[in-house]
């Protein structure tokens, strides 16, 4: 089987790959549009002259400016960290659908608070609004990947969870370009910097409206004992009847997994909490999930997202307009590469190989950019234009983006959404999202100080971390593409890690063939299907 083949766990009717699952994933992913926009717009908005003038930037020392910038950016991540954990009880008792609604409402309240800020009132409303917005997106970053992964057929689960990442990049693209637009078309004023803050309300409003029409996760309904509603929702999503052999297999697998969990860990609210800290198998996967986000943030991506003007200034770009334009192009590159990742790479190349290639290529690019800054010291360039070396540095920066985006940007979210048992999934995703926001907070809080003290060493620091992630992934992270959620336990128990995927998939195919043979011998004929994808054929 080629690494470029899409892997099905069993013959799948064409009706399963329908527009409904893509629509549900797209609606839920307005959450990530909120996250992406907030991550992108804030760094360039606070660099606008109109913002600096209104909040008396010139009266602050350089150290104070760095501190205030870091606080404005990082209080959002602090809120998101706690929001990710608050999402666990909400997701357990209220479900994924209404959890997403609540996260959008809290975010909207935070965005509204920020709009009340001005020079007379000071930055307090921005700080408070950023914390509330962070609470909302932190909870949303828990609910959305789980919701999508629980709806998705295994063969396209990576693609569907990848819609969450695409939403992040689309929001980021708007966030990067909006400040270039207001800087070019509006005179410095209160409105100029307020408009980027107001645009936050658009994806939040779309999510609130969309959530009213989506279906609750069938797997959550099964977990809560609402069986009839769960089967009804699953049939609607799959577009096949409950007595179809595919549905019989899927419902049977869910029932079997829940029964196993009921007899071991338990299905309540408190038992998973206890199990998470005492069960070595679960602790190990929590460690893997948290470390994936450590390596992701250690690549330097959020230093660039939040402080892109500082990053491009270190390479030698002069002028706010040039910095905003270059940042906008950075957003375009990320979005285009994310679309390729979503449509093809994540479910064909798989998670593991993408992480390895991205870490190796991205590390090389960071070493080159850091070495250029060390040798040339472009910040002392008296010319208004980049020289040849500066252009080359910008090229390697964008090449780093092309390596990083289809690997470490969204793949850790995909893996974390699929590698846990159903009764522990909400708690595990809370821990995963919380760890992302913790590392995110640390990077965003100290990036200005790192650039002030380390200069080119910042790039060497990020390059080293990307290099260290390679043995971690190779020896510890198995491939998960095409593996049903109910089969993650044997996948993570199979050794060696680099052969686990092939071994487990072979066992799944063997079990599925035996199940269908037994059904045929019993006289069951309804719902025979042909496999949609030939998994031994190159796409």
Curated annotation (Swiss-Prot):
Q: Which SUPFAM superfamilies match?
A: MFS general substrate transporter (SSF103473)
The alphabetical list of record keywords is: Cell membrane, Membrane, Quinate metabolism, Transmembrane, Transmembrane helix, Transport, Ubl conjugation
* One BP annotation, GO: quinate metabolic process
Kindly list the GO CC terms recorded for this protein: plasma membrane
Give TM segment ranges.
Answer: 23-43, 75-95, 98-118, 131-151, 160-180, 194-214, 286-306, 326-346, 353-373, 388-408, 457-477
Q: How is it modified after translation?
A: Ubiquitinated. Deubiquitinated by creB, probably to control its activity or amount.
| One protein family per Pfam | Sugar_tr
Cellular localization per UniProt? Cell membrane
Query: What coarse category fits the chief subcellular location reported for this protein?
Result: membrane
- Membrane-protein topology: Multi-pass membrane protein
Matching InterPro entries: MFS_dom, MFS_sugar_transport-like, MFS_Sugar_Transporters, MFS_trans_sf, Sugar/inositol_transpt, Sugar_transporter_CS
Topological domains, Extracellular: 44-74, 119-130, 181-193, 307-325, 374-387, 478-539
Membrane-side (Cytoplasmic) residue stretches = 1-22, 96-97, 152-159, 215-285, 347-352, 409-456
Listed GO MF terms: carbohydrate:proton symporter activity
How does this protein assemble?
Interacts with creB.
Family as reported in the entry's similarity comment: Belongs to the major facilitator superfamily. Sugar transporter (TC 2.A.1.1) family.
Known role: Integral membrane transporter that imports quinic acid to be catabolized as a carbon source.
Q: What is this protein called?
A: Probable quinate permease
């Amino acid at each position: 089987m080629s690494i470029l083949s899409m892997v099905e766990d069993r013959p799948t009717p064409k009706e399963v790959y329908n527009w409904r699952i893509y629509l549900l994933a797209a609606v839920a992913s307005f959450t990530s549009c909120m996250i992406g926009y907030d991550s992108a717009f804030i760094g360039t908005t606070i660099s606008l002259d109109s913002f600096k003038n209104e909040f008396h930037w010139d009266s602050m020392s350089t150290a104070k400016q760095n501190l205030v910038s870091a606080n404005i950016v990082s209080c959002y991540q602090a809120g998101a960290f706690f929001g990710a954990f608050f999402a666990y009880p909400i997701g357990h008792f209220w479900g994924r659908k209404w959890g997403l609604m609540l996260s959008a409402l809290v975010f909207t309240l935070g965005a509204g608070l920020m709009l009340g800020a001005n020079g007379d009132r000071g930055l307090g409303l921005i700080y408070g609004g950023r914390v509330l917005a962070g609470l909302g997106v932190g909870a949303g970053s828990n609910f959305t990947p789980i919701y999508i992964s629980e709806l998705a057929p295994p063969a396209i689960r990576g693609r569907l969870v990848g819609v969450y990442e695409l939403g992040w990049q689309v929001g980021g693209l708007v966030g990067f370009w909006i400040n270039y637009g207001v800087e070019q078309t509006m005179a410095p004023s209160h409105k100029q910097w307020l408009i980027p803050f107001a645009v936050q309300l658009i994806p939040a409003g779309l999510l609130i409206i969309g959530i009213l029409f989506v279906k609750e996760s069938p797997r959550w309904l099964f977990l809560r004992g609402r069986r009839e509603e769960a089967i009804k929702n699953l049939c609607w999503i799959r577009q096949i009847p409950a007595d179809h052999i595919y549905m019989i297999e899927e419902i049977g697998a869910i029932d079997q997994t829940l029964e196993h969990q009921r007899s071991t860990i338990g299905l309540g609210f408190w038992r998973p909490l206890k199990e998470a800290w005492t069960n070595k198998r679960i602790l190990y996967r929590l460690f893997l999930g948290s470390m994936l986000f450590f390596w992701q943030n250690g690549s330097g991506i959020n230093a660039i997202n939040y402080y892109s003007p500082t990053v491009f200034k270190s390479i030698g770009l002069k002028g706010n307009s040039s910095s905003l334009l270059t940042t906008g192009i950075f957003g375009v590159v990320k979005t285009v590469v994310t679309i390729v990742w979503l449509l093809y790479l994540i479910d064909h190349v798989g998670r593991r190989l993408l992480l390895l290639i991205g870490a190796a290529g991205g590390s090389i690019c960071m070493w080159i950019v850091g070495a250029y800054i060390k040798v040339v010291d472009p910040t002392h360039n008296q010319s208004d234009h980049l020289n040849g070396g500066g252009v080359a540095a910008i090229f390697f920066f964008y090449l780093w983006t092309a390596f990083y985006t289809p690997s470490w940007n969204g793949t850790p979210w995909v893996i974390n959404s699929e590698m846990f048992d159903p009764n522990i999934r909400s708690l595990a995703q809370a821990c995963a999202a919380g760890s992302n926001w913790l590392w995110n907070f640390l990077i965003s809080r100290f990036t200005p100080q790192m650039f002030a003290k380390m200069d080119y060493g910042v790039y060497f620091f990020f390059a080293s971390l990307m290099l260290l992630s390679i043995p971690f992934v190779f020896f510890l992270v198995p491939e998960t593409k095409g593996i049903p959620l109910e089969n993650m336990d044997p996948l993570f128990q199979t050794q060696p890690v680099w052969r686990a995927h092939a071994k487990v998939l072979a066992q799944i195919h063997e079990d599925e063939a035996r199940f269908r043979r037994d059904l045929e011998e019993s006289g069951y004929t309804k719902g025979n299907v042909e496999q949609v994808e030939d998994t031994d054929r190159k796409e």
